[in-house]
UniProtKB/Swiss-Prot annotation:
Its EC number is 2.7.1.33. It catalyses: (R)-pantothenate + ATP = (R)-4'-phosphopantothenate + ADP + H(+). This is Type III pantothenate kinase. HAMAP family: Pantothen_kinase_3.
Amino acid sequence: MVLVVDVGNTHIVLGVFEGKKLLANWRLGTNKERTSDELGMLILGLFNHEKLSIDKVKSVVVASVVPPIMYTLEHAIKKYINIQPMIIGPGTKTGINIRYQNPKEVGADRIVNAVAGFELYGGPLIIVDMGTATTFCAISEKGEYLGGVICPGIKISAEALYQKAAKLPRIDLVKPESVIGKNTISSMQSGVFFGYVGQVDYIVNRIKNEMHEENVRVIATGGISRMITEESITINEFNPTLTLEGLRLIYERNV
């Protein structure tokens, strides 16, 4: 079995593969205060809950955009799984030609998504990852990483509205029944939700225009993307495990 780990700013997502089959996946909060022992015991507990044997894990692959947690995570993996993890970074074989001014600036999560997206759907392709930040990645018909867009995620937008406007409350992220809100909370929810959907669709269309390619497919992934996909007019498909699949593929290309 292969354990893949995607470390994001808000969540750590883990998946276990047997060959190409995803046996289980879990989501933990990204807590920089956790010790390696706490993290290790959490991972052991997840395996036990699914009745999976941690001893059958032969490799661990990690992609991270949170450097401060990496020492703790690596130590937990070494101590509790007895494996030196493969960390996605410069020098890792991906099969993707990165056409960025400085390829080292591209986040590991974006590269992993590009690998999975092109393998599963082909190109041209736009991948929208709706996490703490929302990222848009453009992939050419030849599988080249062309670049993309980074903007605040929907949760950051909602939280900023609450923190910076004295009379506005904190809101739950839900799809409102109508655009026209009938009270403060529904008005805020409408602005945050429909404003975010509009942002996604507008940026996707601008990227398509600049790519100059026909039949560009748009794939969404990330925490809130299912709800956004249902409302979006540009997203073709929602894939909740895209990043995990990309980690598996990169592992296979490096063994």
